[in-house]
C-alpha cells in the first residue's frame, strides 16, 4: 500500500520540528526576529550614506540556550546574597567576553546584556564600554542594541560623577579592594585606569558626523536625547514610568512586560565635568549648521524629531545666549507679526504633534518669558476662547500659558474662559476636564480669582438640578454619574477587570473638586445616599472609586448642626458593612477614615466598634482587618473602655483646637454658654452660703466670749 501524503500546514510544521537543529524558542519569536536570531539593522541605516551597516555575527543555538537561561535566572533574582549574584554575573560576563556586539543585536540576548549592565561593577562597566568602541553609531541605530546602549549611558554618567567626587583615599581603598577580589591581567588593569570621562568623550566624537541623521531616526533619536540630557546635567528619566520623556509609549510598555527595572541611577541628575558643556556646545552647533528655518519648522512637527528639538530648545540656554534654535523657528522678540510665522503658529495650534511641541517649549524653562509673551500677544490673545474650544490641540496651549504669563494676562484668560466653562466641558466625550483642573489651580494662584463663578459653572455642568443653597433629600446621582460615568465603568464587574486610566482620571478630578470647595463634598454625600446601598458598597471595593469615598469622608471645622445631621445619615449607609470593608484592601482605608469622620458622634463610633467586635475572629484573621483593629484602638474598647472614651475626648479637643499649644479660642455653642452660666450661679450661691455660715459662727463665738456687748457700748458711745 502506498504511503499517504501529509497535507496541511500543521503537518509541515511538525515535520520541520523533527528536523535536527530546529530550535522552537527561536521560531516562536516575533516577526521582527529572523531564524538566524539576528535582528538586521534598520532600513533607514542601510539606505543612509555614512551610517555603518555592520554585521556582528550570529548567536548559535547552544549559546542562545545558555544566555536565555542566564537571563531567566537574573530575572527571577533567586540569589540568597549579593555576593552569590555577583559571582553568577562574573561567570556570565566571562562567557560573553568577545561576543558582546552580537549579543546586543539579538532580541533575547539584548535583554541579558541590559541586566548585566545594571548589575555590573565599575571595572566590568568599563570593559563593556570598550567593547562597543568604534561601533556606537551602529548600535544606536539598531532596534535592540539602542536600548542596551541607553542603559550603558546612564550607568556611565553615574560612574563619571563618582570619579569626579571621589577623594584620593577613596580611590586608593577601591583599588585595594579590587586587587584583593580578583587578579586581572596587566593590560586590563592599565585599560581600567582610563577615566570614564575620556571614554565618554571618545564616544561623543563617534556620533558627531551622524547627529543630523539621528534626529529623526526611530531608535537613534532616543540615544541622542539621552546624550543631550547627560551633557546638560539634567535629570535622566525612568525608562518605565508613564510620563518618561525618554522612551516611546510602546517601549515603556514592552519594558514592563519583560520586567526590566531601573536601578538607583535613573530618575536623577548627575554632576558633569566642564568638558561636557563644551561638548554640548559642539553638538548644538553641529546640528544647527545643517538646519534652516524651513527644515527646523518641519522638524518641529515631525513625530520623531520634534522631541529632540524640544530638548535642544530647553538646554541651549546653557551654552548659547543667542538662543539660536528658538530664533531659527520663530522671529526675534523685537519683530512684529509675520504672515509666514502666523501660518506656522496656526498649524502648531491645530495639529497634534505641533501643539505638543508648542506646549512643551512653553512649559519648559528653556524659552525666555518675553519670547512666549510675544507669541501669545501676536497670535493667540485675541482668540483665547476659540483656542480653548479645540479640545485636542489648542486647549493645551492655553493651559500652559496660565502658568507662564504675567498675572494681568492670566486674569484676562480667566475672564475669557470662566463664563463659558460649562460649555467647554463635554461629559460624553470626556473633553476639557484638564482645563477645569488648570483653571482651578490658576484661580488659587491668583488669590481665588472668580472662585464662586468657577464653582457655579461646574455645578451647572455636572449637577444642573442641584440647589447649592438648599440641597434637598430628593437629590439624584447626576453629579457623580456625570463625572465618574459609573454606568458602563468597571464598577461591579466580577471578572477582575483593572480600573481604566479614564476612570482614574475622572476620580482624581472629583477629588480635586472636593478639595477645592466643601459644597462639592455635600453634593457628593447626597449622591451617595441616593445610590442603592449595593452600588455604594461596590464603590468602596473598587480600586479607583474607593478613593473618592475616602476623600469624601471629611469634616469641616465648626460644622453647623444641619451638616452634622447629614453626616449621621451618611454614616447609616455603612451599618452592617463595616466588617466586610475592614477585611478588604481598599475598604479598610475607608473604615480607618471613619474614625475621624465620626468626630463629635460618639454613638456612631461605639456602633462601628461594636460591629468590629461582633465578628472579631474574622477581622483578626485578615491582614487588613488587623490594621483596622489597631487603628480603631479595639483592644482598649474591649478591655479598658474608659481609656477608649478618653481617646474620643482627646479627638474632640483636637477638633475644637483646645490643646496646650493653642492660642485661639473657638466660638462656644449656646448650650455650652448656658452650662457655664449655671455653673457660675451655683458657685456664687455656694460662696454666699459659706459667708453666711462663717458670719453666724463668728457671732456665736463672740456671744460666748462676751466681746459682743463691749462693742455695742462703744458703738453707742460713738453715736452719741
Swiss-Prot record:
Pumilio repeats lie at residues 95-130, 131-166, 206-242, 290-331, 339-377, 379-415, 530-567, 572-610. Gene3D superfamilies: Leucine-rich Repeat Variant. Keywords: Nucleus, Repeat, Ribosome biogenesis, rRNA processing. Residues 170-190 have a biased composition (Acidic residues). GO terms for molecular function: RNA binding. Residues 1-31, 165-190, 658-720 are annotated as: Disordered. InterPro entries: ARM-like, ARM-type_fold, NOP9, Pumilio_RNA-bd_rpt. It is found in: Nucleus, Nucleolus. One of its GO terms (biological process) is endonucleolytic cleavage to generate mature 5'-end of SSU-rRNA from (SSU-rRNA, 5.8S rRNA, LSU-rRNA). PROSITE patterns: PUM. Residues 662-690 have a biased composition (Basic and acidic residues). RNA-binding nucleolar protein required for pre-rRNA processing. Involved in production of 18S rRNA and assembly of small ribosomal subunit. This is Nucleolar protein 9. It comes from Candida albicans (strain SC5314 / ATCC MYA-2876). The lineage of its organism: Eukaryota, Fungi, Dikarya, Ascomycota, Saccharomycotina.
Amino acid at each position: 500500500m502506498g504511503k499517504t501524503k501529509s497535507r496541511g500546514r500543521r503537518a509541515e510544521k511538525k515535520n520541520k520540528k523533527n528536523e535536527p537543529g530546529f530550535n522552537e524558542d527561536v521560531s516562536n519569536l516575533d516577526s521582527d526576529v529572523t531564524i538566524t536570531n539576528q535582528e538586521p539593522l534598520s532600513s533607514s541605516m542601510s539606505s543612509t550614506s555614512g551610517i555603518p551597516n555592520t554585521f556582528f555575527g550570529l548567536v548559535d543555538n547552544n549559546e542562545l540556550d545558555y544566555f536565555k537561561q542566564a537571563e531567566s535566572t537574573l530575572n527571577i533574582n533567586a540569589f540568597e546574597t549579593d555576593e552569590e549574584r555577583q559571582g553568577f554575573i562574573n561567570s556570565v560576563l566571562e562567557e560573553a567576553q568577545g561576543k558582546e556586539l552580537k549579543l546586543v543585536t539579538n532580541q533575547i540576548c539584548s535583554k541579558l546584556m541590559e541586566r548585566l549592565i545594571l548589575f555590573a561593577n565599575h571595572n566590568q562597566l568599563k570593559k563593556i564600554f570598550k567593547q562597543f568602541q568604534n561601533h556606537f553609531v551602529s548600535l544606536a541605530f539598531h532596534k535592540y542594541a539602542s536600548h542596551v546602549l541607553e542603559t550603558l549611558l546612564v550607568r556611565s554618567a553615574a560612574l563619571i560623577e563618582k570619579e569626579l567626587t571621589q577623594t584620593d583615599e577613596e580611590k586608593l581603598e577601591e583599588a585595594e579592594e579590587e586587587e584583593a577580589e580578583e587578579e586581572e591581567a596587566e593590560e586590563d588593569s592599565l585599560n581600567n585606569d582610563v577615566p570614564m570621562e575620556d571614554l565618554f568623550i571618545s564616544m561623543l566624537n563617534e556620533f558627531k558626523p551622524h547627529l543630523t541623521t539621528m534626529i529623526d531616526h526611530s531608535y537613534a533619536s532616543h540615544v541622542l536625547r539621552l546624550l543631550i540630557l547627560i551633557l546638560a546635567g539634567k535629570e535622566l528619566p525612568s525608562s518605565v514610568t508613564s510620563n518618561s520623556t525618554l522612551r516611546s509609549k510602546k517601549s515603556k510598555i514592552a519594558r514592563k512586560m519583560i520586567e526590566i527595572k531601573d536601578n538607583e541611577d535613573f530618575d536623577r541628575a548627575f554632576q558633569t565635568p566642564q568638558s561636557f558643556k563644551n561638548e554640548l556646545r559642539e553638538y548644538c552647533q553641529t546640528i544647527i549648521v545643517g538646519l534652516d528655518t524651513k527644515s527646523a519648522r518641519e522638524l518641529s512637527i515631525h513625530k520623531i524629531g520634534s522631541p529632540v528639538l524640544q530638548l535642544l530648545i530647553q538646554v541651549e540656554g546653557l551654552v548659547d545666549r543667542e538662543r539660536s534654535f528658538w530664533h531659527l523657528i520663530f522671529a526675534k522678540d523685537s519683530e512684529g507679526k509675520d504672515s509666514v510665522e502666523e501660518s506656522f503658529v496656526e498649524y502648531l495650534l491645530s495639529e497634534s504633534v505641533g501643539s505638543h511641541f508648542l506646549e512643551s517649549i512653553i512649559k519648559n524653562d528653556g524659552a525666555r518669558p518675553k519670547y512666549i509673551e510675544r507669541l501669545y500677544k501676536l497670535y493667540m490673545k485675541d482668540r483665547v476662547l476659540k483656542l480653548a474650544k479645540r479640545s485636542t490641540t489648542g486647549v493645551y496651549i492655553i493651559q500652559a500659558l496660565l502658568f507662564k504669563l504675567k498675572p494681568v494676562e492670566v486674569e484676562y484668560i480667566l475672564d475669557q474662559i470662566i463664563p463659558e466653562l460649562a460649555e467647554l466641558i463635554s461629559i460624553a466625550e470626556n473633553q476639557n476636564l484638564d482645563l477645569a483642573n488648570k483653571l482651578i489651580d490658576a484661580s488659587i494662584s491668583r488669590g481665588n480669582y472668580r472662585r464662586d463663578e468657577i464653582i457655579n459653572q461646574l455645578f451647572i455642568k455636572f449637577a444642573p438640578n442641584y440647589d447649592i443653597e438648599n440641597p434637598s433629600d430628593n437629590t439624584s446621582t447626576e453629579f457623580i454619574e456625570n463625572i465618574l460615568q459609573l454606568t458602563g465603568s468597571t464598577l461591579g464587574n466580577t471578572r477582575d477587570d483593572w480600573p481604566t486610566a479614564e476612570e482614574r482620571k475622572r476620580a482624581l478630578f472629583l477629588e480635586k473638586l472636593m478639595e477645592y470647595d466643601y459644597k462639592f463634598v455635600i453634593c457628593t454625600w447626597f449622591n451617595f445616599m441616593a445610590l442603592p446601598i449595593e452600588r455604594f458598597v461596590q464603590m468602596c471595593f473598587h480600586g479607583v472609586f474607593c478613593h473618592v469615598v475616602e476623600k469624601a469622608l471629611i469634616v469641616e471645622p465648626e460644622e453647623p448642626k444641619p451638616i452634622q445631621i447629614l453626616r449621621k445619615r451618611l454614616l447609616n449607609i455603612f451599618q452592617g458593612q463595616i466588617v466586610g470593608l475592614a477585611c478588604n484592601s481598599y475598604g479598610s482605608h475607608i473604615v480607618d477614615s471613619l474614625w475621624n469622620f465620626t468626630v463629635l458622634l460618639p454613638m456612631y463610633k461605639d456602633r462601628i466598634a461594636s460591629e468590629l467586635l461582633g465578628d472579631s475572629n474574622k477581622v483578626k484573621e485578615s491582614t487588613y482587618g488587623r490594621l483596622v483593629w489597631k487603628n480603631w484602638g479595639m483592644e482598649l474598647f474591649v478591655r479598658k473602655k474608659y481609656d477608649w472614651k478618653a481617646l474620643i475626648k482627646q479627638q474632640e479637643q483636637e477638633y475644637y483646637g483646645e490643646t496646650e499649644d493653642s492660642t485661639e479660642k473657638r466660638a462656644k455653642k449656646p448650650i455650652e454658654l448656658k452650662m457655664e452660666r449655671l455653673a457660675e450661679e451655683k458657685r456664687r450661691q455656694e460662696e454666699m452660703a459659706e459667708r453666711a455660715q462663717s458670719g453666724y459662727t463668728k457671732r456665736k463665738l463672740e456671744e460666748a466670749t462676751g466681746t459682743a456687748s463691749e462693742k455695742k457700748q462703744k458703738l453707742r458711745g460713738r453715736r452719741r
